[in-house]
């Protein structure tokens, strides 16, 4: 019986890097992992149309706030997005508000455990070739399917956009009650090569869900960018 492994975790240290870059004591590790997840989930939920490709989180050593003289944990959050304007807005005040909202998100849990408060440093970076990202392709399909566009038409539109990204291969799978069918099924399409068993293959992967009037549809995208030597 075939066993499946996550395409990104399978290639960590070869073609993929960790999304969270920090070290911690064994006792603090679970809490910090959950804190990272909370920050990421909040950003993806708050900016669904920003086409966020990736969020990298780095943590510095605990330092002292110059004004309050209290200990603070500094967290660097780098957001890679295709549409920076959706996050930045028209003024710098938007970024300040975002930083404050993210700090408040973690503040209550830290107070319960008597831990230092956090200071977030935000960096927003524009991605030049967004449709080479599996996450952006999945977001585009979600938008189409939630607007009741037939799944085959949505796949065709997505493949047209992917051609401009010059990927070496793409595989897309959609599962659920497709076009409102009584029985759920899976449909997939593949263009080019997608060598999932080759470790040196630079493959981006994303799995997301679309909420339609017929129920939830699962979307999986594998994007093959080439082999690393």
Swiss-Prot record:
Record-linked PROSITE patterns: KH_TYPE_2, RIBOSOMAL_S3
Localisation per UniProt entry: Plastid, Chloroplast
One MF annotation (Gene Ontology) recorded for this entry: rRNA binding
Pfam families: Ribosomal_S3_C (PF00189)
Annotated CDD domains: KH-II_30S_S3 (cd02412)
Keywords tagged on the record: Chloroplast, Plastid, Ribonucleoprotein, Ribosomal protein, RNA-binding, rRNA-binding
Biological process terms in GO annotation: translation
Gene Ontology CC: one annotated term: cytosolic small ribosomal subunit
InterPro entries listed in its UniProt record: KH_dom-like_a/b (IPR015946), KH_dom_type_2 (IPR004044), KH_sf_prok-type (IPR009019), Ribosomal_S3_C_sf (IPR036419), Ribosomal_uS3_bac-typ (IPR005704), Ribosomal_uS3_C (IPR001351), Ribosomal_uS3_CS (IPR018280)
Domain spans labelled KH type-2: 39-128
Main subcellular localisation: plastid
PANTHER family: 30S/40S RIBOSOMAL PROTEIN S3, SMALL RIBOSOMAL SUBUNIT PROTEIN US3C
Family: Belongs to the universal ribosomal protein uS3 family.
Subunit structure: Part of the 30S ribosomal subunit.
Name listed for the protein in its UniProt record: Small ribosomal subunit protein uS3c
Organism of origin: Tupiella akineta (Green alga)
């Amino acid at each position: 019986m075939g066993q499946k492994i996550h395409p990104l975790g399978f290639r960590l240290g070869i073609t993929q890097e960790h999304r969270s870059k920090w070290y911690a004591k064994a006792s603090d590790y679970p809490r910090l992992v959950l804190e990272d997840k909370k920050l990421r989930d909040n950003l993806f939920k708050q900016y669904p149309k920003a086409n966020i490709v990736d969020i990298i989180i780095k943590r510095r050593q605990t330092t002292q706030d110059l004004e309050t003289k209290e200990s603070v944990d500094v967290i660097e959050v780098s957001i890679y997005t295709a549409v920076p304007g959706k996050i930045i807005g028209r003024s710098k005040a938007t970024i300040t508000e975002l930083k404050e909202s993210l700090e408040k998100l973690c503040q209550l849990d830290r107070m319960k455990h008597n831990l230092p408060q956090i200071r977030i440093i935000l960096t927003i970076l524009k991605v030049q070739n967004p449709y080479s990202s599996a996450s952006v392709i999945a977001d585009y399909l979600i938008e189409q399917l939630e607007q009741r566009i037939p799944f085959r038409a949505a796949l065709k539109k997505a493949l047209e956009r992917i051609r401009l990204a010059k990927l070496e291969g793409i595989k897309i799978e959609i599962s659920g009650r497709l076009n409102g069918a009584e029985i759920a099924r899976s449909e997939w399409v593949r263009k080019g090569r997608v060598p999932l068993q080759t470790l040196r293959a630079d493959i981006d992967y994303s799995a997301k869900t679309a909420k339609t009037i017929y129920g939830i549809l699962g979307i999986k995208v594998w994007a093959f960018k080439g082999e690393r030597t």
